[in-house]
Amino acid sequence: ALELRPFTRFTIAKSLDDLTNNKLSELMNSIIRDRSTGCFMIGPKNITSKINDTFLVKLSTAIAHLIGVPNHDAMTGKYYARFQVKHEDSSDSYLRKAYRNMDLHTDGTYVKEVTDWLIMTKIDEQNVEGGETAMLHLDDWEHCDDLYEDPVGKQNFVWGSPKSKNIDYKVEHPVFSSDKEGRPTISYIDQFPEPQNMEQGNFLQRLSDGLEESKNKIVTKLPVGYSVIANNYFWLHGRK
């Protein structure tokens, strides 16, 4: 029903919130919109046979719809993306590659839809070493002021995507913008910008180096059944 009847996604969200007398939605929305936090993890105390992929899709759907309306995912053709990271992979991006870091980035850099926040859920894990989740808050980043104040970061960059994303257009937007209070926000991923000149190319290299060398990254093992929910304007995420 969740796949074919969109209104049931709100029904399941309300059912979850009703279990907490609407306190869950209030708490999650206060965290996700607060610049000093903007991110949280949620998961079960114990994994049982009932916490399977079907349950986790339902739970993630409910959480997402208590915060907003998810963007359509063109890669999978659904209201959510689901993929496997495998031992062998021949795809055209880092997303499914087990033995490559996925550098710090934000989501939605190459689509027209606005991406305010994201939810990532680990449904299953077998025969795995490493693969930790990496996170970085923009206000904790040592190089933020330097790069934010560089005028190149405010230029429009061209952003494309590989064929697997099923997006047949390109977009233009700057790497850095600001919120209503004038604080930095970022929209960036290393794989998809198409620099138009030396100035933009060198700026992106400085940006990439500065993010990956940050001493303030949070690197944590995300257990099976757990989700990370993050504000997409000032939290970057990756995989190590």
What spans do the regions from the language model cover?
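Active-site environment of non-heme Fe oxygenases that use a 2-His-1-carboxylate facial triad
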Residues: 1-19, 34-36, 82-224, 229, ...
